[in-house]
Design a protein with these regions (language model features):
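Short helix-to-turn junction characteristic of helix-turn-helix DNA-binding domains
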Residues: 12-13
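Helix-turn-helix DNA-binding helix
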Residues: 31-35
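Pre-recognition alpha-helix immediately N-terminal to the DNA-recognition helix
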Residues: 7-8
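Residue-level signal for the short linker/turn that defines the boundary of a DNA-recognition helix
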Residues: 4, 16-19, 30
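Short alpha-helical "recognition helix" segments of helix-turn-helix
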Residues: 22-25
């Protein structure tokens, strides 16, 4: 689903700091602008929905513990 892909792109960026073009390559050659848009969509959704924001932040926190 596009929601899952967008969240994944956001999380990869937050955890690794990878360049947008490199994240795009992980997702079958999506362009850097597609990745940027996806990250912006997730940031907007997080700003509008505190429960969603906490869920994403918890995922990131749990992944950083490994």
């Amino acid at each position: 689903s596009s929601d899952l892909r967008q969240v994944s792109m956001y999380i990869i960026r937050e955890i690794t700091g990878m360049k947008l073009v490199d994240i795009g390559n992980v997702f079958n050659g999506k362009t850097h602008s597609t990745v940027n848009h996806s990250i912006e969509v997730i940031e907007d959704r997080m700003n509008e929905n505190p429960v969603f924001k906490k869920t994403v932040e918890d995922i990131i926190k749990n992944m950083q513990e490994f």
